[in-house]
Design a protein with these regions (language model features):
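ATP-dependent carboxylate-amine ligase
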Residues: 1-197
């Protein structure tokens, strides 16, 4: 996996907006870690569009959208009772959590729920960074379920649970007005929880 740094993300967004690729202009800034081949495809398609003004924009959008469908990266799943589930369990770090929160804040749902797993490889500041993310989450979510995380942050919105308790606690929220974001580092295997729903 490769991280697209800010310089290239800005370049891609600028070119996308300039070419009215709304898919890129509005959404790519919220995707922080992209598969390198997908990043390459986006740049290649934009350059092709610049060289050939007769390019079919809808076909380019479709190719990019198809390649952006990476399991575990803001993958939309239809849950029980038409609940919207976003599986962002492929990887996690503080920046990607905050970007996901910003993205979620723009969506219109009656209930927004975060199921948060541990962020790996944060070193000595791990507890502090988890606390920071949890604190920020309280501003964007109605309920937060922290899976196997120890934190000092207290709030009526926050529940600290084990994996085995999550599904039972989530089931009362299943309806079409609810969005549930699952996000954690890959090592947490959050997709195993999603599979139980």
């Amino acid at each position: 996996m490769a991280r697209i740094d800010n310089k290239y993300r800005k370049l891609i967004s600028k070119k996308a907006i300039g070419k009215e690729l709304k898919l890129l202009g509005n959404e790519t800034k919220d995707i922080f870690d992209l598969n390198f081949e997908v990043a390459y495809l986006i740049v290649k398609e934009i350059l092709n569009l610049e060289r050939n003004s007769n390019s079919d924009l809808s076909e380019i959008k479709k190719r990019i959208q198809d390649n952006l469908k990476i399991p575990g990266r803001m993958e939309k799943i239809n849950g029980p009772n038409k609940t919207t589930i976003l599986n962002d369990s492929y990887n996690a770090n503080p920046d990607s959590f905050l970007a996901a929160f910003e993205f979620i804040s723009k969506l219109k749902y009656k209930h927004k729920i975060l199921v948060m797993g541990e962020m790996g490889e944060l070193g000595e500041k791990s507890d502090q960074l988890h606390d920071l993310v949890i604190q920020k989450a309280t501003k964007h979510f109605d309920f937060i379920f922290c899976v196997d995380i120890n934190s000092k942050i207290k709030s009526e919105k926050i529940n600290y649970l084990s994996k085995s308790d999550i599904v039972i606690n989530l089931s009362r929220f299943f309806d079409k007005q609810t969005l549930i974001l699952f996000k954690a580092s890959r090592s947490v295997k959050m997709e195993t929880l999603i599979d139980l729903i």
